[in-house]
Amino acid sequence: MPKVKSGAIGRRRGRQEQRRELKSAGGLMFNTGIGQHILKNPLIINSIIDKAALRPTDVVLEVGPGTGNMTVKLLEKAKKVVACELDPRLVAELHKRVQGTPVASKLQVLVGDVLKTDLPFFDTCVANLPYQISSPFVFKLLLHRPFFRCAILMFQREFALRLVAKPGDKLYCRLSINTQLLARVDHLMKVGKNNFRPPPKVESSVVRIEPKNPPPPINFQEWDGLVRITFVRKNKTLSAAFKSSAVQQLLEKNYRIHCSVHNIIIPEDFSIADKIQQILTSTGFSDKRARSMDIDDFIRLLHGFNAEGIHFS
């Protein structure tokens, strides 16, 4: 009998695994490659809806409705549900599920990529979205106007823990502080793999996000520019983080533009490195590390730079 090469066995197993991932439900095949993991546990679905505290007058934005397990429950509670779904097959399944029911007229479906879709007005958002778009979707939500009341969102467990991490936590990062600048964030519950069909490879969590209204009086692009620099190496002192030549070139360019606009003469012996160090020292952050700094610390640091004409966007 001829030997079967290990590479061929590996490829065959890979194809078998792919086929197993495309699970069938009523003839419908789920594509895990684009994050199709349908939440099937009715207890989890009911708990998520309870956490949303819906009002009869609410317009709900649902992202990733799948086959409508949560959608039909939302339609019973809300005035209207706007469901955003990428897969036309699931859209057809969704329409079929509510067709002829008393709540059918309350459903509007937007077909397409939610990141490229102009979101309508909504009061509350509920989402079980593909985990690979978690970060851009969070910030699309938080920068959306007019403000919504709250969002109940399913995320990969580690991503959820990053959202709620505090200064000093191992998972505290740029995502943590940027989200918490714009919103109050709470971890609501853990959701195991077997509550989905097909099961994902990671554990999940449900998070509640409530935007701060009014938002802090800060230019977010400017804020993020500063935070991005400091969290590249969050365990370094800020003095070390700002010694990067790329960072210094960017800040010097921005400073020279600022001086040109405001007719400020720059001395011939000007050194951006010296100016940065002077600001870090005067604000008391020279030896601080991003991993232990909170929102108020970063606001003070940003104001310190801006007061000296240095901007990050």
Curated annotation (Swiss-Prot):
Record's catalysed reaction(s): adenosine(1779)/adenosine(1780) in 18S rRNA + 4 S-adenosyl-L-methionine = N(6)-dimethyladenosine(1779)/N(6)-dimethyladenosine(1780) in 18S rRNA + 4 S-adenosyl-L-homocysteine + 4 H(+)
Keyword Nuclease set for record: no
Entries under Pfam families matching the protein: RrnaAD
GO (cellular component) term, any one: small-subunit processome
E.C. code: 2.1.1.183
Ligand binding (S-adenosyl-L-methionine): H37, L39, G64, E85, D113, N128
EC category: transferase
Biological-process GO terms, alphabetical: positive regulation of rRNA processing; ribosomal small subunit biogenesis; rRNA methylation
Location of this chain's protein in the cell: Nucleus, Nucleoplasm; Nucleus, Nucleolus
NCBIfam families: ksgA
Name listed for the protein in its UniProt record: Dimethyladenosine transferase
Gene coding for it: DIMT1
